[in-house]
Amino acid sequence: MSFRGGRGGFGGGDRGGRGGGRGGFGGGDRGGRGGFGGGRGGGRGGFGGDRGDRGGYASGENIEIGVFSHVCEEQIVCKLTATEQVPKFNCKVLSSSKNTIGSVDEIFGPINKVFFSVKLDSGVQATSFKENDKIFVDSNSVLPIKIFLEEPKPIAKVPKTPGAGGAGRGGRGGARGGFGGGRGGGAGRGGFGGGRGGSRGGFGGGRGGGSGFGGRGGSRGGRGGGRGGF
């Protein structure tokens, strides 16, 4: 009787101890997790503050972009004076007194003489401006003018085929390639017209003088020279 009672006491003591151990372990583990969650919350709060700082980004300085030219349909037209920048569409425009007068509406004209129109704000009179009054914009409201310029593409060389006849054809192809290059590099109809004039001039000269006839004329001139004993 006393022996069984001893086992009972042993078992009870053993299990009780293990149970207590688990209770302590669980409490410690969960407590640790609670602290980790608090750490994550603090981290996110700091990140949100960083984004708030970016929202308050300061604007740039005011720079001269053009001068007043004339009035057109309740808007003012200004001539671009900046050499390397153009204003963005709808950007705010300021007067010489640094007061906002309107926004850029359109940009037009050849690349060496650019104009832009300004849609005036309510209460601003177009007749209040004088010729060559300076116009300003924020330095963050401009774009480099070079992004609107197309770089001339290199002319691809026509490979020559073996044989005399093939060489003559290659020369003719080269002449046409130059004409096409003139059209691309002219950046306008004026350049294109010049290219055509030069091509026809050379062609006509070839017929009169023989040697200036171009690739095709050169081939025929060579044949003629052969017959004459040249």
UniProtKB/Swiss-Prot annotation:
Give the start-end ranges of region RGG-box 1.
4-56
Give the matching SUPFAM superfamilies: Translation proteins
Keywords (alphabetical) are: Nucleus, Repeat, Ribonucleoprotein, Ribosome biogenesis, RNA-binding, rRNA processing
The question of whether Cell division is a record keyword is answered with: no
- GO BP annotations listed: snoRNA guided rRNA pseudouridine synthesis
Give the GO molecular function terms.
Answer: box H/ACA snoRNA binding
The UniProt regions of compositional bias labelled Gly residues, in chain numbering, are 1-49, 163-230
| Annotated spans, RGG-box 2 | 169-229
UniProt GO cellular component terms: box H/ACA snoRNP complex
Q: Where is this region: Disordered?
A: 1-53, 158-230
* Top-level taxon in the UniProt lineage: Eukaryota
Assembly state and interactors? Component of the small nucleolar ribonucleoprotein particles containing H/ACA-type snoRNAs (H/ACA snoRNPs).
Protein name stated in the entry: Probable H/ACA ribonucleoprotein complex subunit 1
Q: Which gene encodes it?
A: gar1
The UniProt similarity line reads: Belongs to the GAR1 family.
Pfam family membership, one? Gar1
UniProt-annotated location(s): Nucleus, Nucleolus
Q: Give the function comment from the record.
A: Required for ribosome biogenesis. Part of a complex which catalyzes pseudouridylation of rRNA. This involves the isomerization of uridine such that the ribose is subsequently attached to C5, instead of the normal N1. Pseudouridine ('psi') residues may serve to stabilize the conformation of rRNAs.
InterPro entries this protein is in? Gar1/Naf1_Cbf5-bd_sf, H/ACA_rnp_Gar1/Naf1, Transl_B-barrel_sf
Q: What is the lineage of its organism?
A: Eukaryota, Amoebozoa, Evosea, Eumycetozoa, Dictyostelia
